[in-house]
Amino acid sequence: MQHYDVFAWFYEWGTEKLHGRHRREAIDLLRLQPGATVLDVPTGTGASIPLLRSRVGASGRVVAVDYSPGMLARARSKVVQAGWDNVDLVEADARKLSRDLVGVDGVDAAICMLGLTVVPAWREVFQRVFDLVRPGGRIAVMDLYLDGKRTSGVANTYYRLLAQADSRRRVWEPLAEQARDLETVDHNWFGGVARIVAGTKP
C-alpha cells in the first residue's frame, strides 16, 4: 500500500469531489443511532469519520482501520484537530481484522467505502467486517462497477492506474447473499455504476 502513502493528498481531494454525495448516502443507509459503535474499513484519509462521528455522537465510537500509514496520518490530523476522543485509528491489514485487533466485542454497523475494489482478498476482508457486526447491525458497501464494455476509457484508466482498483469486482454480492432488508442505490458513472448496497445482518 505504499502507493497510497504517496497518493493520500490527491485521494482526499479527488475522492471527496467525486464521491461526497455517495458517501453521505451510504452513511444514511446505516441508520446510525447515538451511542452506536461503527467500523470504517478502509478509512483511507478518514473522509467518512466526521459524518460517522456526527451520527453516533460523543457517547458512540468510531473504529477506523487502514493499512496505509500515509492515509492514516491524514485521518489522524482530522481527529486531533476536532478533539474527538471516541475515534480509534487502527493501522492493520484488513485480512486480519478481529475483535482483539479493533478493541471491541462487536460493532453496531460497518461501512466499506471505495475499498473492496482495491484490497487483496477482498471477499475475505468483507467477511471479516461482516463477522464483527452484531446481529441486527447494518453494513453498507459503496464502490464503483466499471465492466470495461460500456464505461469510459478515461474512467477505467484512472481507477486502474491511479487508484489501483479493479472495478470489475462485484463487491456488493457477498453482502447481498448474507444480509436482509437490502437497499440499493445506483448512480450512473461514466457508463458504469457507482453502487451503494446496505443490509441488516440476520
Residue locations for each model-derived region?
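A short acidic, Gly/Pro-enriched loop at the edge of an enzyme's catalytic core
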Residues: 95-110
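A short glycine-rich, Lys/Arg-flanked "PGG" loop and its adjoining helix->strand segment in the class I
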Residues: 123-135
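A short SAM/SAH-binding and catalytic strip from SAM-dependent methyltransferases
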Residues: 108-121
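C-terminal lobe and adjacent flexible extensions of AdoMet/dcAdoMet transferase-like proteins
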Residues: 197-202
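Helix-to-beta-strand junctions that scaffold the AdoMet/dcAdoMet cofactor pocket
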Residues: 57, 119-120, 133-134
